[in-house]
Amino acid sequence: MISFIKGVLIEKDPTALLIDVNGIGYEVFVPMTTFYTLGDIDSQVSLYTHFIVREDAQQLYGFKSKVDKKVFQELIKVNGIGARTAIAILSGMDSKTLLHCIENKDYALLATVPGIGKKTAERLVVEIYDKLLKMANEIYAQTSGTTTTSQDSQAQQAPTSVVLANSIFNESVDALLALGYKQKDAEKMARSAMGDATTAAEVIRKALQGSIKSKR
């Protein structure tokens, strides 16, 4: 069981990283809420991990905090929710927002996540309600502050060129597709979130936040 990983960040794409640990490269899948906190390429990275072994694949999932890892582990115990859907949930909302959804039984907001319909949202609330409430203090403690990342610091750069803007748009769409959104929806979300964004991470964050706000 691999429960934690620390190494050098070699590659980073939305939802997937390559981390060098003593010369061995580990592919680690992460939610966008973890991706936003990452440093630059060649920087040190430390993640809490959950290792899943299947007949056709072995996959490692990483999280910025032990709390997020525990929330992920509770999510994948829910009938009908696999690792990909759990990652999509934690990409669209942080643990605190998810807790609010569970407390308020906000089925409509949960159903905005790709792969979750109304019935699955209702089942999720029923199966995870008590467990998540027991973690409330941990969840609120870790979300009391805001982490500044290298992605955030790039927000003050000059407006992007057309070529760079297209690259950011395409990368953002690819990330949203990886999270389970349909092509048409992914393009619409990315286009609406572009604005003066200078990184794909910024566009993805705004797109996912916009999806949540539109349902409130």
Curated annotation (Swiss-Prot):
- Which terms in the GO cellular component ontology are assigned? cytoplasm; Holliday junction helicase complex; Holliday junction resolvase complex
Q: Which SMART domains match?
A: HhH1
Task: Report the SS bond pairs.
Answer: none
Q: Which InterPro entries match?
A: DNA_helicase_Holl-junc_RuvA_I, Hlx-hairpin-Hlx_DNA-bd_motif, NA-bd_OB-fold, RuvA, RuvA_2-like, RuvA_C, RuvA_C_sf
**Pfam families in the record, alphabetically?**
HHH_5 (PF14520), RuvA_C (PF07499), RuvA_N (PF01330)
Q: Does the keyword Amino-acid biosynthesis apply?
A: no
Annotated region (Domain II), positions in chain: 65-143
Flexible linker: annotated span: 144-163
Q: Name one GO biological process term.
A: DNA recombination
Q: Which GO terms label this protein's molecular function in UniProt?
A: ATP binding; four-way junction DNA binding; four-way junction helicase activity
Q: Where does the protein principally reside?
A: cytoplasm
- Kindly give the Gene3D superfamilies that the UniProt entry links to this protein: 5' to 3' exonuclease, C-terminal subdomain, DNA helicase RuvA subunit, C-terminal domain, Nucleic acid-binding proteins
UniProt subcellular location: Cytoplasm
Q: What is known of its domains?
A: Has three domains with a flexible linker between the domains II and III and assumes an 'L' shape. Domain III is highly mobile and contacts RuvB.
Q: Which HAMAP family match?
A: DNA_HJ_migration_RuvA
How would you summarize the oligomeric state and partners of this protein?
Homotetramer. Forms an RuvA(8)-RuvB(12)-Holliday junction (HJ) complex. HJ DNA is sandwiched between 2 RuvA tetramers; dsDNA enters through RuvA and exits via RuvB. An RuvB hexamer assembles on each DNA strand where it exits the tetramer. Each RuvB hexamer is contacted by two RuvA subunits (via domain III) on 2 adjacent RuvB subunits; this complex drives branch migration. In the full resolvosome a probable DNA-RuvA(4)-RuvB(12)-RuvC(2) complex forms which resolves the HJ.
Q: Which family is annotated?
A: Belongs to the RuvA family.
The protein depicted here goes by the name: Holliday junction branch migration complex subunit RuvA
